[in-house]
Regions:
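A C-terminal junction/extension of Radical SAM enzymes
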Residues: 240-259
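Conserved AdoMet/S-adenosylmethionine-binding subsite of the radical SAM
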Residues: 83-95, 104-239
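Short, positively charged and aromatic/hydrophobic N-terminal segments
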Residues: 15-21, 25
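Canonical Radical SAM [4Fe-4S] cluster-binding loop centered on the CxxxCxxC motif
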Residues: 24, 42-77
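Conserved alpha-helical substructure of the radical SAM core
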Residues: 65-96
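Positively charged N-terminal leader segments that act as targeting/secretion signals
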Residues: 6-7
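Short, charged low-complexity linear segments at domain edges
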Residues: 27-46
Length: 259
């Protein structure tokens, strides 16, 4: 079913290459990118993914450096134009993913999600978990159907993994607790980097996050657009070993990005 809908969408996207219109008033959330058709970003749904710019973290292996440290090189896409595109995709797309960067840096993120929900789309939010108050407001308002938190590493190794000495994990821990008690479908996921992650870290993350419905292990891949060069991923066999370590802690454990 997803493949059939995707084929229909691919045929229609040629008419949407120029979604910017002159004279549009910009007074709300701006994105820095729009993936018009995403088949894997939202589990089980065909979606469009909206990328916001800016992030409070500086993970050295981040594959989206343009959205984090070089925003002046990234053109902004006004919210009105994103919504206009989504209006044309009603009945074809199932959902919308708000990703980044870090979406909850955007003061109007909740308002944008409300508009998307009002259009009839399911909503997935990707976040690093650093803004529990904003996450709580979104959850309480029923503005997200699915939330993914990027767990960077064991709590002890967060500072070096996010590139911020002395980083306090308390906000991330609060976001984890919020999701666990929210009743909202969610996942935790970690991008594994050979120079930063060990089997002991995997065990520690499993114990910290245990009881969550699903945990995904993602392999680092060099996008050519990193904040810092010199990082490497693991072999598929090594990642499978990590998955076996955390399997007792979660209902579902899967690998992503393993070709």
């Amino acid at each position: 079913m997803l493949l059939q809908k995707a084929l229909v969408l691919v045929g229609s996207l040629v008419y949407d290459n120029n979604i910017l219109s002159a004279g549009t008033e910009v007074d709300s959330m701006k994105s820095c990118g729009l993936q018009k058709l995403a088949m894997v970003d939202y589990p089980g749904k065909l979606a469009a993914t909206v990328f916001t710019g800016g992030c409070n973290l500086r993970c050295p292996f981040c594959h989206n450096a343009l959205l984090v440290t070089r925003l002046n090189e990234t053109p902004e896409l006004p919210e009105a134009e994103v919504l206009a595109f989504l209006e044309r995709r009603r009945g074809l797309l199932d959902g919308v993913v708000l990703s980044g960067g870090e979406p909850l840096l955007q003061p109007d993120a909740a308002d944008f999600l409300r508009k998307v929900r009002d259009m009839g789309f399911a909503v997935k939010l990707d976040t690093n978990g650093c803004f529990p108050d904003r996450l709580a407001a979104i959850l309480e308002a029923g503005l997200a159907d699915y939330v993914a938190i990027d767990i960077k590493n064991s709590r002890e190794k967060y500072p070096q993994t996010v590139g911020i000495p002395g980083f306090d994990t308390a906000p991330v821990e609060e976001s984890v607790r919020l999701l666990a008690n929210s009743g909202v479908d969610h996942e935790f996921r970690t991008t594994f980097v050979r120079e930063l992650h060990t089997a002991a870290d995997v065990e520690a993350m499993g114990q910290w996050l245990q009881g969550a419905p699903r945990y995904f292990l993602q392999n680092f891949a060099d996008s050519g657009n990193l904040i810092q060069e010199g990082w490497h991923g693991f072999t598929a066999l090594e990642l499978q070993g990590f998955a076996d370590i955390v399997r007792p802690f979660f209902s579902q454990v899967e690998l992503r990005g393993i070709g």
